[in-house]
Amino acid sequence: MEFTEYLMNKHQLKKGERKLREISVGQYENRLINMEREGIYRGEQVIDDELETRLSKRYKDWKTYRRTIRFFIDSKGY
């Protein structure tokens, strides 16, 4: 399942998840693209301390970017 497709449907796939608006899905997709382009996210399958350090050094609101990566990793399971 593609990342954007997962984001649009994750509320149906996982209990307790809320439906995302289309604009939010686009924002998550853009965040992921930018993190990959800048070499912050390198395709890791787990979020470790090193990745969190790279995120916190680059982004003030780094937890939003961490959530983006978590959603991306989760999408690989569908």
Residue spans for each PLM region:
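Non-catalytic DNA-binding core/recognition domains of DNA-processing enzymes
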Residues: 17-78
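N-terminal DNA-binding module of tyrosine recombinases/phage integrases
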Residues: 1-8, 74-78
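Positively charged, polyanion-binding regions of nucleic-acid-associated proteins
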Residues: 8-16
